[in-house]
UniProtKB/Swiss-Prot annotation:
<dbReference type="GO" id="GO:0031514">
    <property type="term" value="C:motile cilium"/>
</dbReference>
<feature type="domain" description="SH3">
    <location>
        <begin position="155"/>
        <end position="215"/>
    </location>
</feature>
<feature type="compositionally biased region" description="Acidic residues">
    <location>
        <begin position="118"/>
        <end position="140"/>
    </location>
</feature>
<keyword id="KW-0796">Tight junction</keyword>
<dbReference type="GO" id="GO:0060041">
    <property type="term" value="P:retina development in camera-type eye"/>
</dbReference>
<keyword id="KW-0970">Cilium biogenesis/degradation</keyword>
<comment type="function">
    <text>Together with BCAR1 it may play a role in the control of epithelial cell polarity. Involved in the organization of apical junctions in kidney cells, together with NPHP4 and RPGRIP1L/NPHP8. Does not seem to be strictly required for ciliogenesis. Seems to help to recruit PTK2B/PYK2 to cell matrix adhesions, thereby initiating phosphorylation of PTK2B/PYK2 and PTK2B/PYK2-dependent signaling. May play a role in the regulation of intraflagellar transport (IFT) during cilia assembly. Required for normal retina development.</text>
</comment>
<dbReference type="GO" id="GO:0030030">
    <property type="term" value="P:cell projection organization"/>
</dbReference>
<keyword id="KW-0965">Cell junction</keyword>
<keyword id="KW-0963">Cytoplasm</keyword>
<dbReference type="GO" id="GO:0097546">
    <property type="term" value="C:ciliary base"/>
</dbReference>
<dbReference type="GO" id="GO:0035869">
    <property type="term" value="C:ciliary transition zone"/>
</dbReference>
<feature type="region of interest" description="Disordered">
    <location>
        <begin position="111"/>
        <end position="154"/>
    </location>
</feature>
<dbReference type="Pfam" id="PF00018">
    <property type="entry name" value="SH3_1"/>
</dbReference>
<keyword id="KW-0175">Coiled coil</keyword>
<keyword id="KW-0221">Differentiation</keyword>
<feature type="modified residue" description="Phosphotyrosine; by FAK2">
    <location>
        <position position="304"/>
    </location>
</feature>
C-alpha cells in the first residue's frame, strides 16, 4: 500500500526542524564537558554531530523543493514561514559545523602530543637496542645495519635554502623569507615538507620554494654555481622518485624550480611558471576546451552544428526534412534531450595577486571520455567580493538576462556511445600584471555520465559534482592539493575537508510537452542557451523554407541571396548582438495579438523584419568594435553602441533614420552579406 502524502508538508518540516533544534541544543550542552570526557565519548559526540548535520541538510533540500501548491489548504504568510524555517536550519548547520571543528581540533592536539611522547619513547628504545646490538654477533650486526640504513636515509635532516618569501596560510605552516636556511625533518609525498628554521621553529613548507643548500657553493665562483645548478637538477629527480609512488598524475607539478630555470632559456609554458611562483594552485592547467575552440576553427562552435548535415549520398539533408502536412520542418527526436541548470560553484581556489582575472566561466560540451561530440557552450559566472570562492549563474538584472549569463542550457545528442556524458570545465581568463600576457586557465573539470552501466538514463535531479584538477585526460589530480593535505592524519579532518573540496552544483530537468516539441525542431546534436532557443528555431524554419520548400530545383547548388541565412551564424559568436535581437523581438512580440501569434507564417515574416531592422545595421556598423572575449573595455563599448542604436530605433519607430543619418558610418558593402552558400556551410558527414 502506498504511503500517504502529508497534508501539510511545510508544517511537518517545521515540526521536524524543532525536533532537530532540541537535539542540537542537547548535543551542544553535552559537549561543554568534552574536555573531561574520554576519547571514545568525544568520537560518539562527533558522530552524532555528523548525523545531525546530514539530517539538517536533508531538511534544507526538502524545504527548497516545497511550493505553495503542495499544501492541501491555504497557508498564510507561506514564504515568510518558509524563510524562517530556512534561517533556523542554516543556524543549526553552522552550530554543528563549529562543534565538529572544535572537537576535531582537540583530538588533533591530543594526537600530536601523543605522537611526541611516542617519539621520545622510541628514542629511548633505540638507545637500548643500540646497546644490545654491541653484544650480538658481528654477522647479525651487519644485517641489522643494512636494514636500518634506508630508514636513516629517510629521516636524515637535509639543509635547503628558500628561493622566495612564504607566508603561513594555515595553522601549522612555517613562515620564511628568501635566503633563509631551513632544515628538512620529513619529506612528505604531497609536496608539503616538515621543516625547522634557524630559530628552531617547526612547520610545514611547500617544497617548490626550496633549493638544496651548500656552503661551499656559496663561496665558489660562478663556475661553481653552475655545477651547483646541475646538482640541483639531480635533487629534483630524487623528488620525482619520492612522489612517484601512487602520485604519478602529479608529474607536471614536480621539479618546479627546475622548470623555472628552464623557462628562462627555453620559454616553457606560462602556466608552469605561474604554478612554480605560487600564483595559481597546482591543479590549474591551460584550458583544454578553450584550446579546442581556438585551434579547431569552426568545428566545435554552435554555428557549425546549427547547419544541416548531408546524407551519405550527398543528395539530401539528413537532419533537415520537410513536413508537408504541417507546412514546416519535421521535428526530430534525439537520444538525449534535456535542460540543464547551472546553480553554483563552491570553494573554487583563488589565483594569486600577480594575475588579474578578467572572466570566470564554465565551458560545457558532450563528451565520451576521449573526444568532444558537440559544440562547446560557454556560460559566464558572477561572484561577490564577500564570497570570492563562490560562482553563481543567472543573476537578477534590469531588463533581459544576457544569454552569456544564462545558466539554463539545453542539451541534445543522438550519439549511441554508452559513455556519453557532459564535460564541465571551469575556467578563468586572466592577464599577468608584470608582462600583460593574456591566457585562459582551467580551474577544474568534472564529467557527468548521462547513462548508467545498464544504459538507463540517470534521474533528473540536482547533482553535487566534485571537481578534478589537471585536464580531462589526467586522472587523480586535485585542484588544490593543500585541502586534502590538511585532512591527513585524522578521520575527523577528512570528513570535514570533504565540504572544502571544489564542487559544482547542477540540476538536470526533464522536458514537458511544450519544451520537448520546441527542442525537437533543433539539430540532433547541439548545446546552447535556453533564452535564445526560440531564435535558433526561427533560423532553422527559415532554412527549411529556403532549402526545401522554395527551391525550384532541389539538386541545384547555386548561391542563394538571403541576408538572414548568410549572417545569422555570426550572432552565435557575438552574444551581445544576439541579446539585441532577443530584446527587439520581445518588444515586437508583445504588440502581436493572440491570433497573430498562432500564425507561423506571420511570425516568420515579422521576425525577418525585426532582424533586418536590428541585426544587419549592427553587424556592419563601424561604431561597433570587433568582439573580443573577456576585454572589459571592448565589451562596454559594444554594449553602449548597441544600447544607443536600439534607443534611436525605438524613438524613431525603426532604424531607417539612423541608417540614413550622416553620423552613421558603415563598412563597405560585401557580397557575403547577402550570399548564402549552403554547400560551404554544410557540416561534413561524420559517418
Amino acid at each position: 500500500m502506498l504511503a500517504r502524502r502529508p497534508r501539510d508538508p511545510l508544517q511537518a518540516l517545521r515540526r521536524r526542524g524543532q525536533e532537530l533544534k532540541l537535539q542540537v541544543d542537547s548535543l551542544v550542552t553535552e559537549s561543554q564537558l568534552t574536555g573531561a570526557l574520554e576519547p571514545s565519548k568525544r568520537r560518539e559526540i562527533y558522530q552524532r554531530c555528523i548525523q545531525l548535520k546530514q539530517a539538517v541538510d536533508e531538511n534544507k533540500n526538502t524545504l527548497q523543493k516545497l511550493n505553495k501548491a503542495d499544501e492541501a489548504a491555504p497557508v498564510g504568510n507561506y514564504e515568510q514561514r518558509k524563510e524562517e524555517e530556512h534561517s533556523l536550519l542554516e543556524k543549526l548547520a553552522c552550530q554543528l559545523q563549529e562543534l565538529a571543528v572544535s572537537i576535531s581540533r582537540k583530538d588533533a592536539l591530543k594526537v600530536e602530543a601523543h605522537s611526541d611522547k611516542e617519539e621520545d619513547d622510541t628514542t629511548e628504545d633505540d638507545e637500548e637496542e643500540t646497546g644490545g646490538e654491541e653484544e650480538e654477533s658481528e654477522g647479525d650486526g651487519e644485517g641489522k645495519q643494512e636494514q636500518a640504513s634506508p630508514k636513516q636515509a629517510e629521516t636524515e635532516t637535509v639543509t635547503y635554502i628558500a628561493l622566495g618569501d612564504f607566508a603561513a596560510q594555515q595553522t601549522g605552516d612555517l613562515t620564511f623569507k628568501k635566503g633563509d636556511v631551513l632544515h628538512i625533518i620529513e619529506k612528505k609525498p604531497d609536496g608539503w615538507w616538515l621543516a625547522k628554521d634557524a630559530e628552531g621553529v617547526e612547520g610545514l613548507i611547500p617544497r617548490t620554494y626550496l633549493e638544496p643548500y651548500n656552503k661551499e657553493d656559496k663561496l665558489e665562483s660562478s663556475e661553481g654555481s653552475e655545477e651547483g645548478g646541475e646538482e640541483d637538477g639531480e635533487e629534483d629527480v630524487e623528488v620525482v622518485d619520492e612522489t612517484a609512488d601512487g602520485a604519478q598524475v602529479k608529474q607536471r607539478t614536480d621539479s618546479h624550480w627546475s622548470a623555472v630555470r628552464k623557462a628562462i632559456s627555453e620559454q616553457i609554458n606560462t602556466v608552469d611558471v605561474l604554478a612554480t611562483m605560487g600564483a595559481i594552485p597546482a591543479g590549474f592547467r591551460p584550458s583544454t576546451l578553450s584550446q579546442l575552440l581556438d585551434e579547431a576553427g569552426n568545428q566545435f562552435r554552435a554555428s557549425y552544428f546549427l547547419q544541416p548535415e548531408l546524407t551519405t549520398s550527398q543528395l539530401a539533408f539528413r537532419d533537415l526534412t520537410w513536413d508537408a502536412k504541417a507546412g514546416t520542418i519535421m521535428s526530430r527526436p534525439s537520444r538525449v534531450s534535456l535542460i540543464l541548470t547551472l546553480w553554483s560553484c563552491k570553494m573554487i581556489p583563488l589565483p594569486g595577486t600577480s594575475i588579474q582575472v578578467l572572466s570566470r566561466h564554465i565551458r560545457l560540451c558532450l563528451f565520451d571520455g576521449s573526444k568532444v561530440l558537440s559544440n562547446i557552450h560557454t556560460v559566464r559566472a558572477v561572484w561577490q567580493p564577500k564570497k570570492p570562492k563562490t560562482w553563481t549563474f543567472s543573476p537578477q538584472v534590469t531588463g533581459i538576462l544576457p544569454c552569456l549569463l544564462d545558466g539554463d542550457c539545453f542539451i541534445r545528442s543522438n550519439s549511441s556511445t554508452p559513455d556519453l556524458g557532459i564535460l564541465f570545465e571551469l575556467g578563468i581568463s586572466y592577464i599577468r600584471n608584470s608582462t600583460g600576457e593574456r591566457g585562459e586557465l582551467s580551474c577544474g573539470w568534472v564529467f557527468l555520465k548521462l547513462f548508467d552501466a545498464s544504459g538507463v538514463p540517470i534521474p533528473a535531479k540536482t547533482y553535487e559534482l566534485f571537481l578534478n584538477g589537471g585536464t580531462p585526460y589526467e586522472k587523480g589530480v586535485e585542484v588544490d592539493p593543500s585541502v586534502s593535505r590538511r585532512a591527513q592524519g585524522s578521520v575527523f579532518r577528512q570528513m570535514i575537508s570533504v565540504r572544502r573540496q571544489p564542487q559544482l552544483l547542477v540540476k538536470l530537468r526533464s522536458l514537458n510537452r511544450r519544451s520537448r516539441a520546441m527542442l525537437s525542431l533543433l539539430p540532433e546534436t547541439l548545446v546552447g542557451s535556453m533564452c535564445s532557443a526560440h531564435l535558433l528555431i526561427f533560423y532553422r524554419q527559415i532554412l527549411g523554407d529556403v532549402l526545401l520548400r522554395d527551391r525550384t530545383n532541389l539538386q541545384s547548388a547555386d548561391l542563394i541571396s538571403h541576408p538572414v541565412l548568410a549572417t545569422f551564424p555570426l550572432l552565435l559568436e557575438q552574444p551581445d548582438v544576439m541579446d539585441a535581437l532577443r530584446s527587439s523581438w520581445s518588444e515586437k512580440e508583445s504588440t502581436l495579438k493572440r491570433a497573430e501569434k498562432r500564425d507561423k507564417e506571420l511570425l516568420k515574416a515579422e521576425f525577418l523584419l525585426v532582424y533586418h531592422d536590428c541585426v544587419l545595421p549592427l553587424l556592419h556598423s563601424t561604431l561597433l568594435p570587433p568582439f573580443r572575449w573577456a576585454e572589459e573595455e571592448t565589451e562596454a563599448a559594444r554594449w553602449k553602441a548597441i544600447a544607443d542604436f536600439l534607443k534611436q530605433s525605438r524613438e524613431n519607430e525603426g532604424s531607417l533614420k539612423a541608417l540614413l543619418s550622416p553620423d552613421g558610418v558603415h563598412k563597405p558593402f560585401d557580397l557575403s552579406e547577402q550570399t548564402f552558400d549552403f554547400l560551404g556551410e554544410i557540416r561534413k558527414n561524420s559517418g
